[in-house]
UniProtKB/Swiss-Prot annotation:
Its EC number is 3.1.3.5. CDD domains: MPP_CD73_N. Residues 1-21 form the signal peptide. PANTHER family: 5'-NUCLEOTIDASE-RELATED, PROTEIN USHA. A lipid is attached at residue 22 (N-palmitoyl cysteine). This is Probable 5'-nucleotidase. The lineage of its organism: Bacteria, Pseudomonadati, Spirochaetota, Spirochaetia, Spirochaetales. Transmembrane segments: none annotated. A divalent metal cation 2 binds at residues 91, 123, 224. It catalyses: a ribonucleoside 5'-phosphate + H2O = a ribonucleoside + phosphate. It comes from Treponema pallidum (strain Nichols). It is a lipid-anchor. A lipid is attached at residue 22 (S-diacylglycerol cysteine). GO terms for cellular component: outer membrane-bounded periplasmic space; plasma membrane. Keywords: Cell membrane, Hydrolase, Lipoprotein, Membrane, Metal-binding, Nucleotide-binding, Palmitate, Signal.
Amino acid sequence: MKRFIPHRVIHAVCIGLALVGCRKLDSRAGDFELTIIHINDHHSHLEPEPLELAVAGERLRAAVGGYAALVHEIQRLRAESKNALVLHAGDALIGTLYSTLFRGRADAVLMNHAGFDFFTLGNHEFDNGNEGLKEFLHYLEVPVLSANVVPNAASTLHGLWKPSAIVERAGERIGVIGLDTVKKTVESSSPGKDINFIDEIEAVRRATVEMQQQGVNKIILLSHAGFEKNCEIAQNISGIDVIVSGDTHYLLGDESLGRLGLPVVGEYPRKIMSPAGEPVYVVEAWEYGKCLGELNVVFDRTGVITSAVGMPRFLLHTNTLQKKGADRKNYPLEEAEREALLVALRMTPEIIFAQENDQIISVLEEFKKEKEALGAQAIGVITGASMRGGSVHRVPDAQNPQGSVATRFVAETMLSDIQSFGAGKVDCVIQNAGGARSNIQPGEITYNDAYTLLPFSNTLVLVDVSGAELKQIIEDALQFALGDGSTGAFPYGAGVRYEARQEPDEHGKRVIKLEVQKKDGAWVPVDERAPYRLGVNSYIARGKDGYKTLGEIVSTRGAEDTYLRDAESLIKFLRAHKNFRAYTDSNVIFRLK
């Protein structure tokens, strides 16, 4: 029987056909062409990642990336390019059980197979301290660069990386400078006191001058300083040609990615003029190995870029393609519609149907087997009573006046994690009850238990708020949880406690008393005019679950995503507290009708 293919699908195919072949590199005799292949912030995401796409009026879900596909595509691009550099802009570690269990070994092995020419340090490379970074670098064969992270002579990390390097392609010398973000590494990670950090602009200026003094006129900055800082560097320092960015997890691209419903921040590449009036091109390739950046540039004889074109490449696993229904569930596609959608996707320049490297599949399979075995190992023991969690215990009631003590426990582990880092300061953490998916029973807790309790891979986001805003954030959550929203919004905290009534007063308010905990353990009332640094998970930071005020603050004033995973924080907490006595208090006093 002939299947009906919706007109919108046919229309999407026509648009895709019009886009194919629309990007061309302009070069002349005597020019030098270079292809820069890059990723950043893969955060131990070694397997394909789920991605939602909007195609021809349909919401689709498919898996993209994964190291087996990335390695295949890197090797293909290398083989097809006249001259290529393959670069990683930092934050290889922290984010999945692969990092927790293998402490960088799995990441290093796969990065070696990928054949990166250079890797720069990110802030999360220091999350397990100097020794943790040294262990990762022991397995890593990729040359490491960082011009502004300088271990002293007595440091265990001394001599393990260089500030910069010069490579040759087709007889042309290319300088590559490494750079890390200073503030986040110092304040939100765990570098040793034997590490000196140099201001980003100062370090780049110095390294650029040194390159130029050696006669190098093609310079690439491989920088984990974040997109905004990298644009600032481009505007203030002459001599740099390309900046391969990391840290900010930005997806750059054109309108074709926007039509797919992806969170495009700006164009790829971003063109900025240096103080010398020469172009600098800044690129970044989102996160978690979901895409692979490809930038093709042409240098003239003086080392100035005359042409720069490229895009992020999404390596889509076609056998995972599904349609999302109105109920948010995933459903298989009918064959005719599936084929039409695949044609539309094939005509989108940024979409490549993934092929995988067989050797990487085998290597990763061994790590997966080991991960499954290690996942059943205990990370700590909880003694005392059960800490209630899950959907039944989200809101305190007469039978369970404390509500979700498990959610308070999750918040405490997040607060403990961020307070353990450097000079960073956070006053309190708020966690929504829907994020803690089960009870926490006394006994051994395994790695798998941690990811069962916290399956959403939310990260810890730091937000600066006033006391009045902190109170309103809790009010918003209570209204959503107790009104016409979801009980999953009900707020619990660490370093913060409150008393609230079930029904609002005549002013629509429920909070009766709100306190924060000082470093000496004393509880004091929240000062509505005072500033507080609040930790929240990345889900409610986007204003989800009725956290309207919080979402508005983040979208207008910004926030700092630490990219510390909630499950990782819990694991770290239990490792440090091998026999932890369960909380019996949820930090909430709830007045029923």
